[in-house]
Amino acid sequence: MAPIIHKNLTAPELVEWALKLEKDSQLTARGALSVRSYAKTGRSPRDKRIVNTTDVTDNVDWGSVNMKLTEESFEKLKTIAKDYFATCKHLFVMDCFAGHDERYRLKVRVYTTRPYHALFMRNMLIVPTLEELQSFGEPDYVIYNAGEAKADPTVPGVTSTTSVALNFKTREQVILGTEYAGEMKKGILTVMFELMPRMGHLCMHASANVGKSGDVTVFFGLSGTGKTTLSADPRRNLIGDDEHVWTDRGVFNIEGGCYAKAIGLNPETEKDIYEAVRFGAVAENCTLDRRTHEIDFNDESICKNTRVAYPLMHIDGALSKAVAGHPKNIIFLTNDAFGVMPPVARLTSAQAMFWFVMGYTANVPGVEAGSARVARPIFSSCFGGPFLVRHATHYGQQLAEKMEKHNSRVWLLNTGYAGGRADRGAKRMPLRVTRAIIDAIHDGTLDQADYEVYPGWAFTFLRGLRTCPQAC
């Protein structure tokens, strides 16, 4: 018997179905949908594959990040997904857009058996109007999320029961063996990292906001380094928290929502994000109080990588059409696990390209499956290594050209550890200190400050501010 197909349901309808079909789904005290992704609570980069076809083989930087898969193997994985769908009672389909700039917008169709996944992508992408749905037609990309079904390790190129495979030729993604919702959104980011350079535009793993005078700031950083938190500034308008493109006209957000790390979320210092976790939002792998259903944001009993996903409209002042001008300030967020980086440094154009391509930072615990329990130093090119398709220097050259053309200022901001190493009990840079530094960047104070060369690093930093201020 064919499954009942639920197409383009509203958020309340998807919440209702999740509560009916998913045994561990429940409402939080503020109405968000609390869900579990079970065995996989982070991305599975070792199981990511890109199909090696003639149209992309020369563009892709093949290696440990972009591992090859044949077209035949991809078709076998897609068959597993479709066969699984055929055994299910319900199938949820969402038609959405990726990209607020309509010149580069992609039509995306998602197939999934879990209402939570459908609601997640409804939040993370851009929901069409009724008129747009009527003329939606065939999608540009299709995601087959059969995460409850296992991949077949005997398929050539598949090495476990988990597979996240992307085919640029057929414009499809197949997900097997993982129910972690983040695989879908990062799949779309990977697509844009391939498509946008073809048009001369820079795809960025970055957040962005804009001031009242139209000044745009872009924050580059790996997951957990502060992109979502720091871009949600009550004095500025949010453009987006994770995925953007820099075109000839300015910056646009690929997504229609935010996917924030929830562990340690503080309603006093991160009020905008806290208040966004309400009805329509998804709370992924969070622990609830049994009686009150309040989220315990400090509970790591399920995982360290607890997440909340909510639409942009849940943030006061977020741009409904998330398109803005060229960046005045670019901030590289580095999670320094050694505690040796200054709180802030100013970079020249040459230094900016070097640090961008090098991407020194640290893996935040839990973001990837099997990651360490403490922050470990890594080099993630372009502050988005897991999602790059082409060689990092290609994106680095694009950034350098755009920075020079639009006279963008570049800053290196340490959101990592101060006064010691992460593995020896040091604490992360206080959020209030980081916010104060960003405020000083925005109001021009740091541009007029007295700088000196940081010994051994060559970049310039605020005189007398080699370590975290006494306010720490």
UniProtKB/Swiss-Prot annotation:
Record: residues binding ATP: 221-228
Key words, A-Z: ATP-binding, Decarboxylase, Gluconeogenesis, Glycosome, Lyase, Nucleotide-binding, Peroxisome
Pathway: Carbohydrate biosynthesis; gluconeogenesis
Localization: Glycosome
InterPro entries reported for this sequence: PEP_carboxykinase_ATP, PEP_carboxykinase_C, PEP_carboxykinase_N, PEPCK_ATP_CS
Major subcellular site: other
Name of the protein in question: Phosphoenolpyruvate carboxykinase (ATP), glycosomal
Organism: Trypanosoma brucei brucei
Lineage: Eukaryota, Discoba, Euglenozoa, Kinetoplastea, Metakinetoplastina
